[in-house]
């Protein structure tokens, strides 16, 4: 809501006669001429008509609306004419009172010049802005044209470069074809010269002298060729060693079984260690068979093959014992509860305490403590069948399957992978 303005009876707005003053819910009008406060607009109009001789509507009847360069200029002219008549009447001795309408506002020549100067300045600024915009547009067009020319020039250079490369490739192909033709011509001439009275060796030597072919091998091909040559030489030697006749070759010694391998282990070995020993014994069996096959070949020409088999068994038994001792569970890394881990509390209840280092966690059941001891070992029995991850406990595997693979299964599915 805008500030209220003073309206006349013919709906004109006067802003130079009075001013509205607001205070809470009440308002009053202050006269600009005498600074008197009036409570209503009717009282304000009556005041300016009575006190300041303002005749409302006189200016509208006396001057034309089209020629209004300055506001109420006709009122001022009529007031000056009436004033001259009043002075003439006063000279005659009769004093008369003439109501002169008060001019609201009049533009002076200075103000008119200022307005004209402001208008000219505004027009000049507008023209200057238009010129600047035109200049900027021209600069942008020039830059765009320069960019297009530069791109066209680069495109032409690229085409020329490609054309030159194609010409060079074609020239190289022509040179290679020319060289091949010359080589064929030389070979044909040499064949014709040697065919009249020479043998095949002279013919081949003349062809070899005319054409020099170089075959270069990469380092990988050289290594592969050397390996193939070594393999062929080893195979030849192997077959030569088997040429020696053998009347009755001795059978290979029986491989050590899982029971023999487990005999080297201590009595406290767990099921996981036994499973590992079975795998190791199988590997040792394969190694023993290969070693027996290798050692029996050069010794077939000698006597006493049974003694050699016994020596092989003795040699293979020592590494197997060492492997079994390494795989035997240690005291600090055992997953089995020892007898000293059972502790009785004050109330007579029996507890199983983990004696690994400074752990000291108590369990009510021995099986729970054995499951807990897996945490301290390096063995990861639970393997994920979706990836290569392995875990010490089944709970960790189930959590991994839920989070990584979004799989949910029962506990019977999460079995330790022993083999």
Swiss-Prot record:
Coiled coil: none annotated. GO terms for molecular function: DNA binding; zinc ion binding. It is found in: Nucleus. SMART domains: ZnF_C2H2. A zinc finger (C2H2-type) spans 29-52, 352-376, 382-405. GO terms for biological process: regulation of transcription by RNA polymerase II. Keywords: DNA-binding, Metal-binding, Nucleus, Repeat, Transcription, Transcription regulation, Zinc, Zinc-finger. Signal peptide: none annotated. GO terms for cellular component: nucleus. Residues 121-179 are annotated as: Disordered. This is AT-rich binding protein. It comes from Drosophila grimshawi.
